[in-house]
Amino acid sequence: MVKALLVGSKVLVPSIDESRYLYSNGFYGKPIGISKPKGPKDIVRPLELSLIESVYLTKKGLINVVDKNGDLLEYKKLYEYSAMKINKFEILYKVYEDLREKGFIVRSGVKYGADFAVYTLGPGLEHAPYVVIAVDIDEEITPHELLSFGRVSHSTKKRLVLALVDRKSEGIRYIMFKWVKM
């Protein structure tokens, strides 16, 4: 079991071997100080995991997260902690977990103005073909918001996907947009 340390809103994997293992088995995390690793051989520094990744990996039984006191954070406790730290965590986590379970590689999409950048092969092997924005299905989206979502995805040649999360049924509907010139 990989040992990880909770530090604020990040989780660190100090062991290089364990960092390499996580990265090579799903492209989890980012090595500290290495902006674009090409593969597991480039993982020569500790790995930094997001809270969303950490909750997922804890649920899958792949990592043990401990706090600054050395106390183990079980899945439920880490989930609750993350929900306090991250706005709309429940919705983001549902989408992250669903996409991972479907076999996609899911990374932060902040630099694209989205919640997630989604890969079929992985970072370093391809450019992310999709950007995903997670939305509560009951939340209204204005036409202006929709256009702003699409602006970045269009300029970076990525497909925009809205993930509509229904909290009642726990289902997720995905809508992909294709922008055309007229």
Swiss-Prot record:
Recorded hits in Pfam families, A to Z, give: tRNA_int_endo (PF01974), tRNA_int_endo_N (PF02778)
Q: Name the residues annotated as catalytic in the UniProt entry.
A: 119, 127, 158
A biological process (GO) of this protein is: tRNA processing
For this protein, what reaction is catalysed?
pretRNA = a 3'-half-tRNA molecule with a 5'-OH end + a 5'-half-tRNA molecule with a 2',3'-cyclic phosphate end + an intron with a 2',3'-cyclic phosphate and a 5'-hydroxyl terminus
Molecular function GO labels: endonuclease activity; lyase activity; nucleic acid binding; tRNA-intron endonuclease activity
Q: Please state the Enzyme Commission number of this protein.
A: 4.6.1.16
Cellular component GO terms, alphabetically? cytoplasm
* Keywords (A to Z) from UniProt: Lyase, tRNA processing
Q: Which SUPFAM superfamilies match?
A: tRNA-intron endonuclease catalytic domain-like, tRNA-intron endonuclease N-terminal domain-like
Q: Which domain of life is it from?
A: Archaea
Enzyme class (EC, first level):
lyase
Tagged with keyword Glycosyltransferase: no
Task: State whether it acts alone or in a complex, and with which partners, per the record.
Answer: Homotetramer; although the tetramer contains four active sites, only two participate in the cleavage. Therefore, it should be considered as a dimer of dimers.
Q: Which family does it belong to?
A: Belongs to the tRNA-intron endonuclease family. Archaeal short subfamily.
User: Which PANTHER family does the record match to this protein?
Assistant: TRNA-SPLICING ENDONUCLEASE SUBUNIT SEN2 (PTHR21227:SF0)
- NCBIfam families from the UniProt entry: endA (TIGR00324)
The job of this chain, per UniProt, is described as: Endonuclease that removes tRNA introns. Cleaves pre-tRNA at the 5'- and 3'-splice sites to release the intron. The products are an intron and two tRNA half-molecules bearing 2',3' cyclic phosphate and 5'-OH termini. Recognizes a pseudosymmetric substrate in which 2 bulged loops of 3 bases are separated by a stem of 4 bp.
Instruction: Name the chain's protein.
Output: tRNA-splicing endonuclease
* Species of provenance: Saccharolobus solfataricus (strain ATCC 35092 / DSM 1617 / JCM 11322 / P2) (Sulfolobus solfataricus)
